[in-house]
């Protein structure tokens, strides 16, 4: 271990209780996507007090921020991705209190080194990773070109085991609405246009579609509004749907098929329909083995047992970042192997001593990774060259 690494690790150890407190404060005050006013303000205050320049209200996300610390000397730009939104009804059952705090701690811990040796640190506060209306802020940031001056992006995610970056699926989230004509269901049903019939036809059509799509494709949804009274022909219904696929290219095809099912269902019932995307489209993750190798080496230095897994069925807007710069999204263990995300048990683990340990471990790993990338321009160049190759490939999963 180099003297520079030891200095950074000493900083993290000395200040860890302060950052554990921040994580607990965010955990105890969960906020939904694009409503994370407390969490974002707390992280911004911490970064500002450490001498970072703060930009707020990023790319249409009021609770987004970019915190920058720039050396007078040339060097690479290292991005740390901070998440801090919670889940409806469950709170921090995905551990974003750990993610956001670990990224901030990693960023501030290398500030003195960057100031002396060159480079730029950027901590991106990224709201609404869990989605929802105007969700997946990282996709907005990518569209706005906000990562164009970055060399790599680093983050860690709590999990039931410690993993390298796993595959993720591209996802679209949209609402389907049907518009009919109200009528009394007994006296003059013949004058009505039943929007619920259209919705039921739509769901039946999706069930039939599933036998003609790839095994890796996913279509799932719920009815949000099915009408108000059983003796009135519903003139309006609404459902929310997710479509997922192994790549953006495949997902565009799948979502197009779902829209044609909606069109057919409307035609069958004599209704009109609308399909509205309510959040940013999320892309699959482009995994960079060289960057993950670097993560694994540094994780093992800190006594983490790292597993490899090629079966991932979730989605994250960090995938969008991976389409523009080399990015990692590894997991750090916070509880037993039986732990499952988006559960009360995971929420409890995210606020436990195990979660605190993962926060500090994640910050140490990301910080020492960043030092190696700054110190070794040839290694960074190889990682970026591999990303260019991977980005140019067309994935065709059968």
Predicted regions and their residues:
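Acidic/His- and Gly-rich active-site-bordering loop/insert found
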Residues: 2-122
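Histidine-centered active-site/metal-ligand motif
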Residues: 27-29, 85, 92, 96, ...
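Active-site-proximal beta-alpha loop/turn segments in soluble metabolic enzymes
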Residues: 28-29, 122, 129-131, 180-188, ...
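Divalent metal-coordination and catalytic microenvironments
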Residues: 26, 67, 80, 96, ...
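Histidine/acidic-residue-rich, glycine-tolerant segments that coordinate divalent metal ions
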Residues: 63, 68, 85-93, 97-98, ...
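Metal-dependent amide/peptide-bond hydrolase catalytic core
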Residues: 200-398
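Non-cysteine beta-strand/loop elements that form the S-adenosyl-L-methionine
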Residues: 79-81, 174-175, 179, 329-335
């Amino acid at each position: 271990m180099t003297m520079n690494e030891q200095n950074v690790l000493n900083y993290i150890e000395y200040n860890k209780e302060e950052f554990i407190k921040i994580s607990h404060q965010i955990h105890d005050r969960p906020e939904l996507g694009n409503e994370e006013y407390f969490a974002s303000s707390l992280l911004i205050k911490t970064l500002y007090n450490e001498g970072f320049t703060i930009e707020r209200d990023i790319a249409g996300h009021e609770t987004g921020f970019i915190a920058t610390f720039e050396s007078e000397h040339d060097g690479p730009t290292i991005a740390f991705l901070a998440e801090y939104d919670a889940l409806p009804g469950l709170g921090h059952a995905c551990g974003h209190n750990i993610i956001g705090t670990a990224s901030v701690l990693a960023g501030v811990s290398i500030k003195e080194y960057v100031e002396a040796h060159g480079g730029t640190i950027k901590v991106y506060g990224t709201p609404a990773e869990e989605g929802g209306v105007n969700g997946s802020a990282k996709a907005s940031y990518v569209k706005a070109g906000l990562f164009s001056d970055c060399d790599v992006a680093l983050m860690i995610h709590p999990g039931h085991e410690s993993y390298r970056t796993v595959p993720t699926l591209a996802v679209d989230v949209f609402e389907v609405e049907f518009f009919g004509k109200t009528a009394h269901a007994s006296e003059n049903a013949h004058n009505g246009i039943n929007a619920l019939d259209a919705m039921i036809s739509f769901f039946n059509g999706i069930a039939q579609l599933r036998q003609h799509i790839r095994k890796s494709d996913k279509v799932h949804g719920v009815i949000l509004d099915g009408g108000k009274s059983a003796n009135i022909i519903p003139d309006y219904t609404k459902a929310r749907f997710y479509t997922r696929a192994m790549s953006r290219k495949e997902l565009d095809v799948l979502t197009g098929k779902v829209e044609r099912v909606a069109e057919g269902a409307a035609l069958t019932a004599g209704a009109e329909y609308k399909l509205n995307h309510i959040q940013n489209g999320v892309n699959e993750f482009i995994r960079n083995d060289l960057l993950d190798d670097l993560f694994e080496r540094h994780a093992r230095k800190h006594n983490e047992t790292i597993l490899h897994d090629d079966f991932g069925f979730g989605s994250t807007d960090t995938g969008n970042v991976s389409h523009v710069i080399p990015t990692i999204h590894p997991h750090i263990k916070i509880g037993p192997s039986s732990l499952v995300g988006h559960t009360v048990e995971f929420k409890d683990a995210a606020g436990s001593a195990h979660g605190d340990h993962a926060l500090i471990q994640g910050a140490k790993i990301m910080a020492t990774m960043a030092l190696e990338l700054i110190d070794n321009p040839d290694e960074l160049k190889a990682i970026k060259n591999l990303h260019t190759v991977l980005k140019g490939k067309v994935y065709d999963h059968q």
